């Protein structure tokens, strides 16, 4: 699948325009995008990064990393996904960067999601849904989510997000109404961010292949 990821990332470069500050996500597919972006870095002003991992890779290539507080709204955000449905709703957060990813997506006029074909699903939920939580609320939220959804929350032990929080992964879900579940989970006290990107879903999905498919 690495070649499919690379092809999706290369296709996304076509959406980068001169003078842009580009929002950059996190993950293995985005790593290919950062590498491709490095080849045209003379055309862009810099990048807003969603994680320390992506920041390090951008800086390795000499791409200027700009804080979102200083960049203002962005024209373009490119990120991957753990799952993607036919309506361009996503599950994200396998790399634990979901909160910053969602913030940058919200700040961006256009959100391009780059995936390999294995990430396309008819119904979201086979991939465990990540939820970033305040540490003291972890057990409470796990019980509430179990009661609310029937899913099985597990604590991603040993993982601390860039924001200093913890991750619950919710297994055994069939998410037929992603926007509703995103809204309901967001209302639980102690939830920082839900890894459902439904209210702010992708505008374009690029599925890597020969040739890449643009949805």
Swiss-Prot record:
GO MF annotations, alphabetized: ribose-5-phosphate isomerase activity
GO terms for biological process, alphabetical: D-ribose metabolic process; pentose-phosphate shunt, non-oxidative branch
Gene: rpiA
Entry keywords, A to Z: Isomerase
Gene Ontology CC, one term: cytosol
Family annotation (Gene3D superfamilies): 3.30.70.260, 3.40.50.1360
Function: Catalyzes the reversible conversion of ribose-5-phosphate to ribulose 5-phosphate.
Pathway as given in its UniProt record: Carbohydrate degradation; pentose phosphate pathway; D-ribose 5-phosphate from D-ribulose 5-phosphate (non-oxidative stage): step 1/1
Annotated source species: Stenotrophomonas maltophilia (strain R551-3)
Catalytic residues (UniProt): 101 (proton acceptor)
Official protein name in the record: Ribose-5-phosphate isomerase A
InterPro entries hit by this protein: NagB/RpiA_transferase-like (IPR037171), Ribose5P_isomerase_typA_subgr (IPR020672), Ribose5P_isomerase_type_A (IPR004788)
Family (UniProt): Belongs to the ribose 5-phosphate isomerase family.
Chain sites annotated for binding substrate: 26-29, 79-82, 92-95, 119
Catalytic activity: aldehydo-D-ribose 5-phosphate = D-ribulose 5-phosphate
